[in-house]
Amino acid sequence: MMLYFFDPVYMMLAVLGYFVMLLLASTIAPKVASRVSGKFSLFTSMVLLAGMILAISAAIIYLILAYAGVYISFYGLIIFLLIINLLMYLLSPYIINLSYGAQRDERLQMVVNSVARRLNVKPPKAVVVRSPPNAFAYGNFLTGKFVAVSESLMRMLSQEELEAVIGHEIGHHKHRDNAVMLLFGLLPSVIFYLGYALLHSSMRDDRRGAQLAAIGIAAVIVSFIVQILVLAFSRLREYYADFEGVRATNKDAMQRSLAKIHLFYHRYPDYLAPIQDSKFRTLFIYAFTNAVAEPITRADIEALKNMKVSPIQEFLSTHPPLPKRLRFIESIRVF
């Protein structure tokens, strides 16, 4: 990646892409979201969004292959990105275990087993980690599945609240979110680097240079649009995991657990930095979007549900903002 730092083409594309993302997140995305909000169920929304991501990605990749011809080793790029991401997928559980000092815990395992039975899934391995209050799910077919909970979070939550958090994390395993988001996360990268390669190719082609450059720039812009859609898809998966937390316990327990974590980081902001800077922050149950309230009582939670959310913060985040999560949990009907 250091080579790209000195590449003016790469830097130009990166700046262009981030400008596109900010424009989408601040103007277009909120308007589109407001129009479709509430019109579809959570599952239908995920299916439609996944279909849109795949359709847009397939269309731009087909366009590049159809018009770029032999200028890009497309399959070589795909294989390279797949290998890199597969290695990260396989090695990340070992890295997480070392980074956070993960240790098996029998008491936590009993809670995980109980919640897993309610959700009709095989219980993952329960580990306690050294970190500020948080929880996350990780693992693969080699290491097995893990649910990690920090010692501080275990002390902070009641038994029922802890079960709600664990239900959320088991939900990620149940929905295969790690693998799903790995695959969807590849698409923006593939499109971006195809566009980047096309722009370089255009400089060496006097006959088709302008055409290749135009397609390359379009591909880069589309890659950031797809990235916005992938982030939206990730937020829907978080809602889906919250649904499992409610199924495992109840709405109030799920809301209280999120509110307690929220309150901790508002009172002790110094603990935010190591979580926000972590390479694994997308795994955490709590993401730090618009964290300013102090929910202690039910009235505090009700007030938090009605807080305004920054569109840019929301649309550039992998997790929904807390007010929207609380409102979603309130709307859940479990049969």
Curated annotation (Swiss-Prot):
Its EC number is 3.4.24.-. One of its GO terms (cellular component) is plasma membrane. One of its GO terms (biological process) is proteolysis. The active site is at E169. Its cofactor is Zn(2+). The keyword Hydrolase applies. InterPro entries: HtpX_protease (IPR050083), Pept_M48_protease_HtpX (IPR022919), Peptidase_M48 (IPR001915). The keyword Ubl conjugation does not apply. Zn(2+) binds at H168, H172, E238. This is Protease HtpX homolog.
